[in-house]
């Protein structure tokens, strides 16, 4: 049995190899997921959220992950998503403006894609929350 898992995040712009860690906590469509060493192999959809991971020194880390897919296979965790950002890389003004635009679109539901506006709102809120941590 292995004591660690390996985390890699793939986006269209970049691959983020976090490396060996103790645990990943993220949010799937049905709620929170905690992935520990020797987790059963699985694939699930993810919501835009703050993904948390604990490194080998026990430090808690956060990274924004947008909607996507999580795959667990043989103590390797792969997150494939549209975007991923570390807290220090998030432009808070841009995230706040995106939240305001999404909220306005949802208030005026005429001729908009509600699901798309909701996802934009979820992404912006997660980005804002991670900056507040």
UniProtKB/Swiss-Prot annotation:
Membrane topology: Peripheral membrane protein
Organism: Clostridium botulinum (strain Hall / ATCC 3502 / NCTC 13319 / Type A)
Self-association and partners: F-type ATPases have 2 components, CF(1) - the catalytic core - and CF(0) - the membrane proton channel. CF(1) has five subunits: alpha(3), beta(3), gamma(1), delta(1), epsilon(1). CF(0) has three main subunits: a, b and c.
PANTHER family per the UniProt record, alphabetical: ATP SYNTHASE DELTA/EPSILON CHAIN, ATP SYNTHASE EPSILON CHAIN, CHLOROPLASTIC
A Pfam family of this chain: ATP-synt_DE
Entry keyword set: ATP synthesis, Cell membrane, CF(1), Hydrogen ion transport, Ion transport, Membrane, Transport
Coarse class of the protein's main subcellular location: membrane
Protein family (similarity comment): Belongs to the ATPase epsilon chain family.
Protein name as it appears in the record: ATP synthase epsilon chain
Function in brief: Produces ATP from ADP in the presence of a proton gradient across the membrane.
Stored Gene3D superfamilies: ATP synthase delta/epsilon subunit, C-terminal domain, F0F1 ATP synthase delta/epsilon subunit, N-terminal
Classification via SUPFAM superfamilies: Epsilon subunit of F1F0-ATP synthase C-terminal domain (SSF46604), Epsilon subunit of F1F0-ATP synthase N-terminal domain (SSF51344)
GO biological process, one term: proton motive force-driven ATP synthesis
